[in-house]
UniProtKB/Swiss-Prot annotation:
Gene assigned in the entry: lpqB
Oligomer status and interactors: Interacts with MtrB, probably extracytoplasmically via its sensor domain.
GO CC annotations on file: extracellular region; plasma membrane
Organism: Mycolicibacterium smegmatis (strain ATCC 700084 / mc(2)155)
Transmembrane segments: none
Protein name (database record): Lipoprotein LpqB
Amino acid sequence: MKRLLTVLVVGLVALVSGCAGIPSSSSPQAIGTVERPAPPSLPKPTPDMDPDVLLREFLKATADPANRHLAARQFLTESASSAWDDAGSALLIDRVVFVETRSTDRVSVSMRADILGSLSDLGVFETGEGALPDPGPIELVKTSGGWRIDRLPNGVFLDWQQFQATYKRYTLYFVDPTGTTVVPDPRYVAVSDPDQLATELVSKLIAGPRPEMERSVRNLLDPPLKLRGPVTRADGGKTGVGRGYGGARIDLENLSASDPHSRQLLAAQLIWTLSRAGVAGPYVINVDGAPLDDRFADGWETSDVAATDPGAAPGAAAGLHALVNGSLVSLDGQRAPRVPGAFGQAPHQVSASVSRNGQDAASVVAPPGAPDPAATLWIGPLGGSTVQAMEGRTLSRPSWSLDQAVWVVADGINVVRAIRDASGTPARIPVDSSAVSSRYPGPISDLQLSRDGTRAAMVIEGQVILAGIEQTQDGRFLLTYPRRLGFGLGNSAVSLSWRTGDDIVVSRTDPEHPVSYVNLDGVNSDAPSRNLVMPVSVVAANPSTVYVADQRGVKQLSASADEENSGWVEVSPLMVPGSLPVLPG
């Protein structure tokens, strides 16, 4: 047998700083199940295709999940198509190398590639890294119609470039356990008819959250509730759904939520999911043939569910605070006076946080040279007196939950909730973080709760780790499903802060990129670095502004700043070395 070794490099998209360009909008399909025509741009096999070209085009075709990957199956022989199991998660690969051994009518190929992430059958994308383990040989045979794949590994390998062209990112919204706000659950779905977008998203809401969120959120659209039919325009038309002034009409049945607050939350899930996907209102929501709420029989608007706005910044009215020379100050124009009460008077405060309602604060006091335990946590109203909640050799920066509990990490390993009873006396309640420590051993140097209180982002030995927050029926709290975000950040993370429910800002030891962003998928990107002086330590963020502490003081970056020309701007009253920004959160 004549052997010819051919090396082909497929897909030249480089992964820059671990950052992947993720598409953000278009209309979806559930992976591998929806029966629709394939997009016209997908490749098809032709009689004159060489084996290497056919394999490359096959990887592109796997990006379309319709009809159990029918577009990709056209590249297979009948027997290979029957044997191929395309169920489950797909691996997203780049920098593919094929090594061929060929004869006249048969080619055997081994595949090497870099893994950039995975895509579950629910459309949940997570970044990854490393080399693709050998999936086994791919065999091609010569047929009357040209070369075809006759043997291939089970599972789906998605070409990264084609994934970017085919899949778009949308966000489903579920309800936090307190019924206060909505919680993002990003999904990636394949492009199809835009008039079916709303139907697909509502169907996904009814199907429920991703597995890691099932015990952290509520879903007011749980079965037995279901759609009576496709989502239409508000007037019942089937085209132009959610575009222009057409609005959207959602007809549901088997509703079990009867109280007004639950119905309001159900509407919030639908409205924020559709609105953030570009499906414009008004939103006519009917259940069992009648309006969900008679007040909105002609349609809901986002303003009707503004209390649950996922983009809102709770406690924003409290404004920016900071620790300057160890005491808490508040920004007042070009002044930064100490706040009244204990927080403004106490020295040696090394970290602090304002409560999410902007009325209370928590700070860690650590006098230099003090004997163990050296750090103490103090909680109280802004402008009032404080009580000591706990102590430890070290205590991390405090973070507030929606139920007014303060979370800290004691001694780098013990996650603790401090919560005050009706009399104001604080209780110290341990959080079960064994799922985190068993997978990511090492001290937790920073822990910050998401604004909806359902997730915790941590810095562990310079890596960004995300975990879900679950409350058991007996009232215990657990950190669950830990996973690493932002592989491109390496081990450079110092501090982090949630900018939104889906976006985390990270300060780093990297002088080229001292501040970066990472989202819930794990995709990271870099913020501007102009005007920052290393080292950059604490970061505090809200949807409108990011604040960091660098060598000279506190600087800010507006979310509306021009990306090409933006630089960090000094917060003049806080330009004191060692000053640390403090926001609600």
